[in-house]
Each structure stands twice: as C-alpha cells, then as structure tokens.
Amino acid sequence: MKVFILALLALAATTAIAQLETTCSQGFGQSQQQQQPGQRQLLEQMKPCVAFLQQKCSPLRMPFLQTQVEQLSSCQIVQYQCCQQLAQIPERTRCHAIHIVVEAIIQQQSQQQWQEPQQQAQHKSMRMLLENLSLMCNIYVPVQCQQQQQLGQQQQQQLQEQLTPCTTFLQQQCSPVTVPFPQIPVDQPTSCQNVQHQCCRQLSQIPEQFRCQAIHNVAEAIRQQQPQQQWQGMYQPQQPAQLESIRMSLQALRSMCSIYIPVQCPAPTTYNIPLVATYTGGAC
C-alpha cells in the first residue's frame, strides 16, 4: 500500500515538473537556444527547484490514509528532489545554478511584473525563498547570489579607497591606545575600534550588490601587501593559511558590522585564487 502511495506521489511530482518543462520550453524561446550546454544541463537538473519555488506542485488530498501515516504532498516530493539535485551540484557551482533558477522564474513571469518598483519586491521575495531553501535542504546554499556586475577600473579604485579602513583593520595595523588613566569609568576606544567603526560605516554605504566586489578588493589589497612568495602558485603551503586568515577576518567583520555581507562571493576574476571553492562552507 505504501509503495503504491509513494508511486502515486512521485507520479504527481513528475507531472508537475513535466508541466513546468513545457512552460519552460515555451517561455525561454530564443534565450534557451543561446544557453551553453552546461547551463542547459544545470537548468534540467534544477527544474524541481523551479517547480518548488513557484509552488506549481499542489498538495494531494488522500483521505483514505490513516492519520498516523504522514501525508506527503507533491510539493514535498518536489522539494525532496530539489534538495537532492542541489546536494549533487558542487558548492562552487551552486551560485550559478541558483542564478539559472531565478532567471527561469523571471522569464516565466509577465514582463510588467518585473518593472520598478515591483522588481525590488520580487527579488526580495526570491531571496527569502532561497534562504528557506538553504534551511530546508540542510546544505550550504549561498544566501545571496547576485551576478557580479563589471565595474570599471576607476570604480574599483574608488571602492578600494573607500574600504581602506577595512584593510587596515583586517591586517590589525592599528594598535590599541595606551590609557594612562584607567580609573576613569569611560571606555577608552582603541585605534582599532575606531578603524573598525570607520570600516563598518563605509561597508554600510556600499550597495549590497557591490559589497562582494568590494570585499574582493580588500582581499586583493591585503594579498599585494604580503610577501610575493607566499602567494605564488595555487597550492603553496602558505596560501591556505593566508586565505583562512582572510576568511576568518571577514566572518568576524560580518558579525561586528551587523550589516548584510554576502556569505559566499563569486570567485574573483582579478587573481587566480579561489577564495570560495578551496574551503568547505566557503565564505568570502
């Protein structure tokens, strides 16, 4: 009996995905033809996630089931398939896979729904769905995977200058101030605390979609100030320690600043070091 029920649920889930596949083939049109084979394969692999996020699966009513038997809905089956597919995708590729899912959903929406000011609400809703997906699947899914916009050289230089306090703080080039009068019951801020405050203030002024690039600029600035031999080659013994130090500093920065900083940033294009892909649970 249970086998029959599970088969029925799987059939319902497959039907939902098949309906989605028809919609996708009609909705994508020319853009689907322009996709590379790897992107098409990812889209096929992520169709359960598209179906689940759009809630195109509907709960099945089975009154004949006993109350102690969990009544799985077709949505739960599709959710399971989605999580299973996500778990099979390498961590460094999940951000790209999620972009494809979001793009598929956007292209299936009517164009007017994605015009301002509705667009901002739609993206916020999508981000919340992806955060829930990360919790439900119990695997690492980037909280925010925003396509890294290409910034001009002048803009990148401005970002780097803006985040000079962060570079200083992460390198701990600020030294605590010696307080000659410890009896004064007023907290004497250290120079590091002042620089930390400046760093957080600068980060908060940078738009969310550019913070990942800004953080990479900070990491690049720190890298360039390290002895050159420590950064040569992809698998030098010194390199993991350097990257781990930066990763831990950025995690601390994320907590101290109390602002949104992407948990995972796309691999930087300015140098050959995969800050994310090298480490499990990758953070910037």
Swiss-Prot record:
UniProt entry tagged with the keyword Kinase: no
InterPro entries referenced in this protein's UniProt entry, alphabetically: Bifun_inhib/LTP/seed_sf, Bifunc_inhib/LTP/seed_store, Glia_glutenin
PTM comment, free text: Contains disulfide bonds.
Annotated GO MF terms: nutrient reservoir activity
Residues in the signal sequence: 1-18
Keywords assigned: Disulfide bond, Seed storage protein, Signal, Storage protein
One matching Pfam family: Gliadin
Top-level division of the source organism's lineage: Eukaryota
Family membership noted in the UniProt record: Belongs to the prolamin family.
Annotated function: Seed storage protein. Might be integrated via inter-chain disulfide bonds within the glutenin polymer.
PANTHER family linked: AVENIN-LIKE B5, PROLAMIN PPROL 14P
Protein name as catalogued: Avenin-like b6
